[in-house]
């Protein structure tokens, strides 16, 4: 799974961030909300402020390479090279399985990570389900 984010001060491509996360959890349907945990040492962390926007992009099986790029700090500059990124506002991957657009409602610190609570504002999805999964250290 991949999340991309634009903080309140980040509106251009050079300020955009993307990171692969291993888990996104739904919290509630009323209001629709989810959480994601981000390591405090990651580059994206300091952009995660209340009121900023992000998008959870659930990847397709054929997007394993992009997932690996977004999890490798040595490939940081390659994260937005894919032609399917839409960078107009909150960056999202147009050909992902689904996109879940959120605004940050709460950020809670817990040891090495921050727990980010996002309120879902919009979503898009493909009808054909071919979602990339990561289980027991392997993609499937």
Tell where the protein language model's regions lie, with residue ranges.
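A short mixed-secondary-structure module that forms the rim of ligand-binding clefts
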Residues: 19-62
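Single conserved hydrophobic/aromatic residue that forms the stacking wall/gate
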Residues: 1-12
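Short structured motifs
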Residues: 48, 84-88, 102-103
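Flexible glycine-rich active-site/ligand-binding loops centered on an Asp-His dyad
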Residues: 107-140
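A residue-level detector for short acidic-glycine micro-motifs
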Residues: 23-26, 104-106, 122
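Short beta-strand/strand-turn micro-motif
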Residues: 14-22, 99-102, 118
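Mid-chain, well-packed structural core segment of small domains
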Residues: 68-97
């Amino acid at each position: 799974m991949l999340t991309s984010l634009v903080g309140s001060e980040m509106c251009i491509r050079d300020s955009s961030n993307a990171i692969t996360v291993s888990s996104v959890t739904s919290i509630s349907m009323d209001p629709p909300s989810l959480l994601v945990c981000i390591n405090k040492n990651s580059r994206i962390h300091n952009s995660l402020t209340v009121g900023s926007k992000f998008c959870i992009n659930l990847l397709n099986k054929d997007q394993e390479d992009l997932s690996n790029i977004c999890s490798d700090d040595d490939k940081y500059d390659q994260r937005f090279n894919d032609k399917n990124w839409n960078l107009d506002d909150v960056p999202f991957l147009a050909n992902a399985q689904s996109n879940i657009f959120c605004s940050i409602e709460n950020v809670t610190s817990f040891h090495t990570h921050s727990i980010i609570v996002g309120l879902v504002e919009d979503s898009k999805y493909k009808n054909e389900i071919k979602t990339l999964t990561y289980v027991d250290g392997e993609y499937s």
